[in-house]
Amino acid sequence: MNVSTAGKWSGPALAVLGLLVAGAMALTPAAGRSTLIWWILSSALAPERVLPLIGLGAALALVDRRYSLGALALFGGGVAVGFFGKDWLLSVLAAIPRATSHHFLTGPISSVTVGVALVLPTARLRSWFLLIAAALAGCMLAIAIAVTDPSLHDVAIPLAGVVVGFWIVVAISLTVRTFWRTWFPIPARILGSWLVAIGLLYGGASLIPKQKSAFPLPAESTPNIIPFPGPDRLSPEFQPHERPGAVIPPADLQQP
């Protein structure tokens, strides 16, 4: 196997290798999982995190290699900006209503931006917008890693999140290039429209406040007591009877 053949199949090999590692993590007994493995399975590989990265990888395969490498570099730069400018970015995103309870809407923002890059009609417009989408997706990935990090100080978790993100983008991009067909832009636009729709629906649902119940709940201090019916409302078998004993005779029968 020569170098060109090995490079051609590097994408599928990278994808299979990553899937095997993820499968081994998923098969690990829950009691034996470390914090890192638990975080990778529950956060780094969460659908809202993976879908925009899959779309970004597909978008990189649709453009010229020069733009693809530039977008990948901007993706890495966006990750760095997201980590070092985390406090400022969080303060900006916190202005969005209810963003703090939905990971600062990092998933919807990435999905919509990458989806737009996929559905743009012309290759030139797609290539230029992809640079912006890649940088923004990198920023959102870094913010998502920071706000879901349970350790707060363990370097392994942010590093693993970045590695997983780059693995998804690069593996998808190289695999699509390996099996490239001229009709690939059609399903890519369908994927982009799905990402835009998912991002808008999820983001819109996150902005809607929870509706209060139309029926007020009873106060806890008010006991639910059913009054016991009086004697006149009891059935005959439950009516009170006089106790047996001496009975006073009528006055006309009493002896003097």
Predicted regions and their residues:
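Short, solvent-exposed mixed-charge patches
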Residues: 254-256
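Membrane metalloprotein/metal-transporter helix-bundle signature
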Residues: 1-251
